[in-house]
């Protein structure tokens, strides 16, 4: 997370992670354009609940139309990617304005969600599910 001066505009960067997804979020002042992997945000994340979850740090800090976001995200599925975007947006907002720290921290947006897929065990069908038991 570093702050740099890019073409006379204040640019802030945040890296977010969730499951196996990594998102690099670049924020600068603008009109509210959001681009994910050079695509429009609404066409990249098509499920409404995932869009709402990814943009919740902006809604919480009342900065939804004030910044342009450029996001590079890779790895994992769409749910993990939207969680990584949320984490990256939160970190970039904190880097841009440190007064957002208490709001973001109290809602858990600055904390990385460390839940991962549990591995499959041998002698079982899945991670927790066992094979069907036959008494006779």
Curated annotation (Swiss-Prot):
Any one GO BP annotation for this protein: translation
Superkingdom in the source lineage: Bacteria
Claim: Lyase is one of the keywords in the record: no
Pfam families in the record: Ribosomal_S9
GO function terms (MF aspect): RNA binding; structural constituent of ribosome
Transmembrane segments: none
Keywords: Ribonucleoprotein, Ribosomal protein
GO cellular component: cytosolic small ribosomal subunit
Matching NCBIfam families: PRK00132.1 (NF001099)
Family: Belongs to the universal ribosomal protein uS9 family.
Protein name: Small ribosomal subunit protein uS9
Taxonomic lineage from the root: Bacteria, Pseudomonadati, Spirochaetota, Spirochaetia, Spirochaetales
Gene designation: rpsI
């Amino acid at each position: 997370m570093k702050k740099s001066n890019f073409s006379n505009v204040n640019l802030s960067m945040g890296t977010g992670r969730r499951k196996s997804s990594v998102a690099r979020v670049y924020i600068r002042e603008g009109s509210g354009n959001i681009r994910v992997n050079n695509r429009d945000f609404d066409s990249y994340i098509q499920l409404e609940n995932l869009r709402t979850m990814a943009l919740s740090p902006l809604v919480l800090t009342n900065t939804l139309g004030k910044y342009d976001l450029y996001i590079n995200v890779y790895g994992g599925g769409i749910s993990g990617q939207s969680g990584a975007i949320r984490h990256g947006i939160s970190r970039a907002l904190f880097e841009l304005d440190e007064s957002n720290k208490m709001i973001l921290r109290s809602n858990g947006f600055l904390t990385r969600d460390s839940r991962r897929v549990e591995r499959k065990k041998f002698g079982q069908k899945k991670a927790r599910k066992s094979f069907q038991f036959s008494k006779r």
